[in-house]
From Swiss-Prot:
Organism: Sodalis glossinidius (strain morsitans)
InterPro entries, per database record: SAM-dependent_MTases_sf, UbiG_MeTrfase
The protein, known as: Ubiquinone biosynthesis O-methyltransferase
PANTHER family: METHYLTRANSFERASE, UBIQUINONE BIOSYNTHESIS O-METHYLTRANSFERASE, MITOCHONDRIAL
MF term (GO), any: 3-demethylubiquinol 3-O-methyltransferase activity
Family from the record: Belongs to the methyltransferase superfamily. UbiG/COQ3 family.
Binding site for S-adenosyl-L-methionine: R52, G72, D93, M137
Keyword S-adenosyl-L-methionine annotated: yes
SUPFAM superfamilies reported for this sequence: S-adenosyl-L-methionine-dependent methyltransferases (SSF53335)
Gene3D superfamilies from the UniProt entry: Vaccinia Virus protein VP39
GO terms, biological process: methylation
Region (Disordered): 1-21
């Protein structure tokens, strides 16, 4: 299978854009060319990706031979790593530039996966129950209606399948660490990457999950030690956190 980007041109423009923030798309389009630069704006994503992947592998029982959907795949960092584990990966994103970068990198790396420029809501209409595993990492805080994303992910996964979310908690500590610290002091990510008003409390995310056939399985925090320049997982979910859910059989 040759990696491809589907523009889904047949979909009405208004429908395609209903849960998309054009400012967020433009923000990531502008830096997409540096997505795979290990020392660039996406350095933190490259650093946390092994943690994300290991968590997904452990909680899902492995990905080999499974149909996996990566929602908000961007330039393909997580999507490629899951494909290397033997998964049949599809990546979704609404940013044309990140998808172009993802497609090119996959071709250069010889990794087999497919990319589509399509909203997750549209994909859920066309492919309900098509996936064994769905991942939605660092994406919910960048859309107008994150609850809609959760519902679509629940629709896309098979009964008994796994859905993984990651996002940022909304509180003063998260503002201090993720915005003041990461964007202004340490300059780990570009200024303006995050908006505290779009951060999501775990209780809010769990509430949206409870309104679907998904059920919480595990939640864990993602932490950064600036002295050692190292990310690690821990029980505290005050800032970044990952949630593992499973669709009821």
């Amino acid at each position: 299978m040759i990696p491809e980007v589907s523009n889904e041109a047949s979909q009405p423009a208004a429908h395609r854009q209903e849960n998309v923030d054009p400012n967020e798309i433009a923000k990531f389009d502008a830096v997409a060319a540096r997505w795979w630069d290990l020392e660039g704006e996406f350095k933190p994503l490259h650093h946390i990706n092994p943690l994300r992947l290991d968590y997904i592998l452990e909680r899902s029982g492995g990905l080999f031979g499974k149909n996996v959907l990566d929602v908000g795949c961007g330039g393909g960092i997580l999507a490629e790593s899951m494909a290397r584990e033997g998964a049949k990966v599809t990546g979704l994103d609404m940013g044309a530039e990140p998808l172009a970068v993802a497609r090119l990198h996959a071709l250069e790396s010889g990794v087999m996966l497919a990319y589509h420029q399509q909203t997750v809501e549209e994909h859920a209409e066309a492919h309900p129950g098509a996936y064994d595993v769905v991942t939605c990492m660092e994406m919910l805080e960048h859309v107008p209606d994150p609850a809609s994303i959760v519902r679509a992910c629940a629709r896309l996964v098979k009964p008994g399948g796994e859905v993984f979310f990651s996002t940022l908690n909304r509180n003063p500590k998260a503002w201090l660490m993720a915005i003041v610290g990461a964007e202004y002091v340490l300059r780990m990510v570009p200024r303006g990457t995050h908006d505290i008003t779009k951060f999501i409390k775990p209780a809010e995310l769990l509430g949206w999950v409870d309104d679907t056939p998904l059920r919480e399985q595990h939640i864990i925090g993602l932490h950064y030690n600036p002295l050692r320049d190292r990310f690690y997982l821990g029980g505290n979910v005050d800032v970044n956190y990952m949630l593992h859910t499973r669709r009821q059989a």
